[in-house]
């Protein structure tokens, strides 16, 4: 979603929210949470507040009038009823016959509510320096995790990674072969953004940064002499990320055309730009997802930017056998998250042995 459209949608949701949600929004913006995260959270709050009114758990005539007392006095049974509603409600997607939301979506809804309740009961201060209330009912609501062993997950993910020589082969394919099958009109569009698209793919494969971190990258955050970029990690922490050397040429080629091709001025801070009717804008997450999907599908299999992150992590673990190093590269505080890559690499080693 384009940044301008995203901000418009955020303002639409803010206009109907209670004052304490607006306080929450302002507080998290200062962390900073990304606009995309805050937008998703606001959507979840609307879903929840709509249900409160439909279930007669508030007498408020509209969402903005739902008071803190309502949230304070909700019971565990009330929240469990909300979860059941999410699980059993007819799907709003007319193309799907499945009823109810997926467990992943339900977990996301509960995560958003947990964040709001934590803010209201622990983080915010009233005039007396106390939180708005103390009872956090969300601490009593458990979420159901998807049951899958690491070995099973590794097997599912492995097919969507560009390991070994495939990392550079993918970049080489986009650079030299992709356009050969395009029409003349399509070639013109491809060539306009070729350097930028290659730079994005190379950066994701060479650093393992999250999609949001790549989107929010500014020109000042990129040091090609040191091959280091500065990103804002989850939770608002600033981090320096090393970038593998194979990405340097692609990034330099993009920088050489960035200003001229995208009409960039001094005030255009975003590193990755798109241009529409002569106006440069920060490239958004949706556009990058579509771009990566388009090229990867033509090369081998359609993947997301997150799979390119998995690719870097797996290759780095294979080269170093250090979960600590991989955790630091990905911006994780624990090595537990990187257990997945040990399973992928071990499976690759077994395959190699079987071929001896």
UniProtKB/Swiss-Prot annotation:
Keywords: Cell cycle, Cell division, Chromosome partition, Cytoplasm, DNA integration, DNA recombination, DNA-binding
Subcellular location: Cytoplasm
Disulfide bridge map: none
Tyr recombinase domain mapped to chain residues: 169-354
Regulation: FtsK is required for recombination.
Domain Core-binding (CB): 16-121
Gene Ontology BP annotations: cell division; chromosome segregation; DNA recombination
Record: active site: 210, 234, 306, 309, 332, 341
Main subcellular location of this protein, as a coarse class: cytoplasm
One GO MF term attached to the UniProt entry: tyrosine-based site-specific recombinase activity
Recorded GO CC terms: cytoplasm
Family: Belongs to the 'phage' integrase family. XerS subfamily.
Function: Site-specific tyrosine recombinase, which acts by catalyzing the cutting and rejoining of the recombining DNA molecules. Essential to convert dimers of the bacterial chromosome into monomers to permit their segregation at cell division.
The protein's name: Tyrosine recombinase XerS
């Amino acid at each position: 979603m384009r940044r301008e459209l995203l901000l418009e949608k955020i303002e639409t949701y803010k206009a109907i929210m209670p004052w304490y949600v607006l306080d929450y929004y302002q507080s998290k913006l200062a962390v900073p949470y990304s606009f995309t995260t805050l937008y998703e959270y606001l959507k979840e709050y609307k879903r929840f507040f709509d249900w409160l009114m439909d279930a007669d758990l508030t007498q408020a005539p509209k969402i903005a009038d739902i008071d803190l007392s309502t949230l304070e006095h909700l019971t565990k049974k009330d929240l469990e009823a909300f979860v059941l509603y999410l699980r059993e409600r007819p799907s709003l997607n007319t193309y799907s016959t499945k009823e109810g939301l997926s467990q992943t979506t339900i977990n996301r809804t509960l995560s958003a509510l947990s964040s709001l309740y934590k803010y209201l009961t622990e983080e915010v201060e009233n005039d007396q320096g106390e939180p708005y209330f103390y009872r956090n009912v969300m601490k009593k609501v458990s979420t159901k995790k998807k049951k899958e062993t690491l070995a099973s997950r590794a097997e599912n993910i492995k097919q969507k990674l560009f390991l070994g020589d495939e990392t550079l082969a993918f970049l080489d394919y986009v650079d030299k072969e992709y356009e050969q099958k395009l029409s003349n009109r399509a070639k013109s569009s491809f060539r306009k953004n070729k350097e930028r698209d290659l730079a994005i793919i190379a950066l994701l494969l060479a650093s393992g940064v999250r999609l949001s971190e790549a989107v929010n990258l500014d020109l000042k955050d990129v040091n090609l002499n040191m091959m280091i970029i500065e990103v804002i990690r989850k939770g608002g922490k600033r981090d320096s990320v090393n970038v593998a050397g194979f990405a340097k040429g692609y990034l330099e080629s993009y920088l050489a055309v960035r200003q001229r091709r995208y009409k960039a001025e001094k005030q255009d801070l975003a590193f990755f730009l798109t241009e529409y009717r002569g106006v440069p804008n920060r490239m958004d997450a949706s556009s990058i997802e579509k771009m990566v999907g388009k090229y990867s599908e033509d090369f081998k299999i359609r993947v997301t930017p997150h799979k390119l992150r998995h690719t870097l992590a797996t290759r780095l673990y294979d080269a170093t056998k250090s979960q600590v190093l991989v955790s630091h590269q990905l911006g994780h505080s624990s090595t537990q998250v990187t257990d997945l890559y040990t399973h992928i690499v071990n499976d690759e080693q077994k395959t190699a042995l079987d071929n001896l």
